[in-house]
């Protein structure tokens, strides 16, 4: 009877070891992942190994890294590191730049002196690709650029949105139809609001100065935003500067041409005056010579008998 009790007690003690239990760890592709493994050093520092697959009866199969308790003595790849305090019992394995092929079972085996005293922990690693996240979209707001007197803008819907509610209970089904007819909206630069309620579906608008947003399924709100200050156009200023420079250059050329024309005219006028004076002097000299010759002829005629 006592032997049967001892046998049953032994089976109960061995039963947990016969069931495989894994510690699940998840990682992301391209990021480091750490498999935690520690042991108590109150009995002293001992050797530890990491391997791929389940822990065998002794040592590690497909060894990745090995430590003697003070430092790493074997390292299969630079991607496998022990970044904890090894001498304090922290032998956690860190896999750098993890990939999907790193997924699988890993064994951390701490060798403790004695029969079947080794500390064995099996990890199940799952490395999945990173899921891209999209930033939330925000509704855009358009501001009208035209300013001045108020203008009237009317909108016309191309369809009549309807909503049908059907009851699946025993009473007869009921149908509710919502109809929206847009009314002309007066748009002012300083205060303009237009509200539309009772629209079951989203109704976009294409005219400037309004933004349509739907908070839920059964109501829409259309709001017109007053125009802001018109933005300056640098291209327009550039063209204005070019036009001013061209006008200044044309004015300078015209001034030079007019000045030169006036100087040439004055020079030609002075030359004509000098020529006129010279011709006048020559005429006077010729007249004097003719007059003297006439007097000589008179004297000659008078001397004859």
Swiss-Prot record:
It comes from the Eukaryota. Disulfide bonds join 37-108, 49-60, 55-107. It is a single-pass type I membrane protein. It is found in: Cell membrane. The chain crosses the membrane at residues 238-258. GO terms for cellular component: brush border; cell surface; plasma membrane. Glycans are attached at residue 208. Phosphatidylserine receptor that plays an important functional role in regulatory B-cells homeostasis including generation, expansion and suppressor functions. As P-selectin/SELPLG ligand, plays a specialized role in activated but not naive T-cell trafficking during inflammatory responses. Controls thereby T-cell accumulation in the inflamed central nervous system (CNS) and the induction of autoimmune disease. Also regulates expression of various anti-inflammatory cytokines and co-inhibitory ligands including IL10. Acts as a regulator of T-cell proliferation. Interacts with STAM. Interacts with SELPLG. This is Hepatitis A virus cellular receptor 1 homolog. It comes from Mus musculus (Mouse). The lineage of its organism: Eukaryota, Metazoa, Chordata, Craniata, Vertebrata.
């Amino acid at each position: 009877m006592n032997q049967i009790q001892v046998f049953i007690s032994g089976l109960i003690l061995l039963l947990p070891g016969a069931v495989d239990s894994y510690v699940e760890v998840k990682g992301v592709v391209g990021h480091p992942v750490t498999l935690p493994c520690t042991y108590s050093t109150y009995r002293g520092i001992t050797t530890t190994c990491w391997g791929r697959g389940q822990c065998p009866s002794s040592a590690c199969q497909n060894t990745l890294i090995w430590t003697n308790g003070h430092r790493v003595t074997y390292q299969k790849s630079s991607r496998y590191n022990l970044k904890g305090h090894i001498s304090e019992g922290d032998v956690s394995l860190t896999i750098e730049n993890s990939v999907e092929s790193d997924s699988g079972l890993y064994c951390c085996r701490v060798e403790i002196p004695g029969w079947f005293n080794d500390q064995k922990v099996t990890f199940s690693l799952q490395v999945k690709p990173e899921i891209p996240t999209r930033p939330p979209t925000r509704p855009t707001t358009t501001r009208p650029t035209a300013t001045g007197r108020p203008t009237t803008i009317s909108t016309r819907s191309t369809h009549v949105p309807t909503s049908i509610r059907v009851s699946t209970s025993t009473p007869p089904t009921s149908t509710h139809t919502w109809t929206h007819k847009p009314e002309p909206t007066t748009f002012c630069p300083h205060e303009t609001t237009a509200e539309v309620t009772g629209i079951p579906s989203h109704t976009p608008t294409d005219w400037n100065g309004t933004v349509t947003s739907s908070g839920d399924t059964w109501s829409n709100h259309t709001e017109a935003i007053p125009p802001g200050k018109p933005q300056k156009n640098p291209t327009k200023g550039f063209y204005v500067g070019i036009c001013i420079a061209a006008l200044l250059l044309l004015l300078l050329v015209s001034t030079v041409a007019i000045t030169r024309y006036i100087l040439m005219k004055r020079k030609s006028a002075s030359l004509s005056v000098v020529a006129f004076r010279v011709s006048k002097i020559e005429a006077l000299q010729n007249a004097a010579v003719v007059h003297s010759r006439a007097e000589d002829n008179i004297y000659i005629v008078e001397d004859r008998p």
